[in-house]
Swiss-Prot record:
Site (Transition state stabilizer): 35
Functional description taken from the UniProt entry: Destroys radicals which are normally produced within the cells and which are toxic to biological systems.
Any Pfam family matching the protein: peroxidase
PANTHER family, A to Z: L-ASCORBATE PEROXIDASE 3, THYLAKOID LUMENAL 29 KDA PROTEIN, CHLOROPLASTIC-RELATED
Amino acid composition bias (Basic and acidic residues), ranges on this chain: 116-126
Listed name of the protein: Putative heme-binding peroxidase
Superkingdom of origin organism: Eukaryota
Residue sites binding heme b per the record: 163
UniProt region (Disordered), positions on chain: 44-64, 116-135
Active-site residue numbers: 39 (proton acceptor), 179 (tryptophan radical intermediate)
Essential cofactor(s): heme b
EC numbers for this chain: 1.11.1.-
Amino acid sequence: MASKPGDFDAVRKDIVSLLDQPEYDDGSAGPVLVRLAWHSAGTYDKSTDTGGSNGAGMRYEAEGGDPANAGLQNARQFLEPVKARHPWITYADLRTLAGVVAVRAMGGPEIPWRAGRTDFADDSRVPPRGRLPDATQGAAHVRDIFYRMGFDDREIVALSGAHSLGRCHPANSGFEGKWVNNPTRFSNQYFRLLLSEDWREKTVAGTGLKQFVAVDEVTGDELMMLPTDLSLTSDPVFARWVKVYRDDQDLFFADFAKVFDKLMELGIKRDAEGKVINKENVEGGYVSAPKKQGKIASKL
């Protein structure tokens, strides 16, 4: 039975109920939902005030088919039953709320979230491709991408802590493996591992991309880091915050909650009462996500 419009608690409960996915990566949809929320907002450009979390642009090929969003068709499909039960919620609200709920359900901080996003009526407002981070790059690229969105160095490192969740797949990003031992539990282990392990270069079979790996002596797990991850330790300003978050998980959680909230609000204009006033959008209807599959792929 459909919920009453505005019953976001009911939506939250349904999101939590779908996180357990035994046939999917590490048995959880949580990490890919966080990635979906992140990529939905990470297209923002403050200089042109374009992109951001409004519009649900991944419903269109121009954004949904971006190679940087490969694999996110699974996240979008996970959320379709929730959308069906709560047809009043926009895709833009649902996809950002799902990321916030997933972080909390996986042991992370409570992140503020505000409703009111609308869905693009067509693809004319979809931002251009190329705005998401290129993991093969270094600190200069990381700053270019995140400064464009309006983040500072501390916020960049805090947001990078989301790599405590999930794993990479060669067919999606060209990289392979997980960052931490338990990729479905939000923690500061990402920062601890960045500084404690002897990371050695490895070429990913089939893609030729360079990443860095280390073997956990206790569990035998092979863990990995991306070039952009290691740039956080080679750059002195970034490295300072890596050390801070390594030593203080509570501070990391507090900072992450603030900066993820900021990320989810990129591109959103609100009036004094908090109502979204982006004039170029309407309450959009359903548009099938590009490359939508009949069955969710567990190994990509």
